[in-house]
A protein has these predicted regions:
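Hydrophobic alpha-helical segments
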Residues: 1-77, 82-124, 129-130, 137, ...
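Acidic- and glycine-rich mobile interface elements
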Residues: 192-194
Length: 264
């Protein structure tokens, strides 16, 4: 089973609107020459008989196609959880830039609203991952092995949502030479998408757009539920949004703090 490295609150990255703080411009993604000739939705990895029959196959294809091409993606999440005995809503965002074949990457994860404000900047390559973490006024550095694929592509967080629902094909089309399939959730196992202490999922909707290579280009999920801790009951919300901003190789700038972190 895939598990998100970001945890239940999905910590997130903040980027100033219209400002790319991570690296150089991306090389625009080029649709594959076979997209226009795709025979139907069942040609998409993991899709069969008009539904998402094998989410793990789709996610594996997503990881491979995204990492080989290079990309920029954006992940946002609001989730209500129990923290320190209180019902709180965590707001997070992560934005990630990855060079082709994962030779270098950067991402920033921030969280706030119901949690101590924090920011984690990560730079890495095929040998090492370096993190600068700031919680309040405290700054710490750490190093470790390269980031896992699902930390970069988002598949670790998408996994429970895709495996926890039945998705059926709602639409297929070709746009700018790229074959796209839209699937929507028609039934959901609430235990797969709710946090601990969450019950009674309602008004839940989920939608995913994939291309012929299996890349998840868009994912949206939202709903309400009840959160209980001790004698306290509150209203919970889940609101997840993922999108691929661009595909293609790019230059990744190495942050000036990396030497400090490597020597710490």
């Amino acid at each position: 089973m895939r598990r998100s490295r970001l945890g239940a609150c999905l910590l997130v990255l903040v980027v100033l609107a219209g400002c790319n703080v991570f690296g150089g411009p991306a090389t625009p993604g080029t649709p594959t020459g076979t997209d226009a000739a795709v025979s139907g939705p069942d040609a998409v990895p993991g899709v069969a008989d008009g539904r998402l029959a094998d989410p793990e196959t789709l996610l594996a294809a997503h990881d491979g196609a995204m990492l080989s091409a290079g990309f920029e993606n954006d992940f946002r999440a609001n989730r209500t959880v129990v923290r320190n005995g209180q019902v709180v809503t965590i707001v997070g965002r992560q934005r990630t830039l990855v060079a082709a074949n994962r030779t270098e990457y950067r991402y920033r994860v921030t969280s706030g609203a119901g949690a101590p404000s924090s920011r984690f900047d990560t730079w890495g390559n095929q040998s090492v991952r370096v993190v600068r973490g700031q919680v309040g006024d405290t700054v710490r550095y750490s190093t470790g092995p390269p980031a896992d694929a699902n930390d970069l592509t988002g598949s670790g967080t998408l996994g429970p949502y895709l495996t926890g629902s039945t998705f059926e094909v709602a639409d297929s089309r070709t746009s700018d030479g790229r074959y796209l399939v839209t699937l929507v959730a028609t039934a959901t196992n609430e235990s797969a998408v709710l946090p601990a202490n969450g019950t009674d999922l309602r008004n839940y909707q989920a939608r995913v757009v994939v291309d012929a290579s299996g890349r998840v280009l868009e994912f949206e999920a939202s709903g309400n539920y009840t959160v209980t801790t001790g004698s306290t009951t509150g209203s919970g919300v889940v609101d997840i949004s993922y999108r691929v901003i661009s595909l293609g190789d790019r230059e990744i700038d190495r942050p000036e703090w990396v030497p400090t972190a490597l020597s710490a």
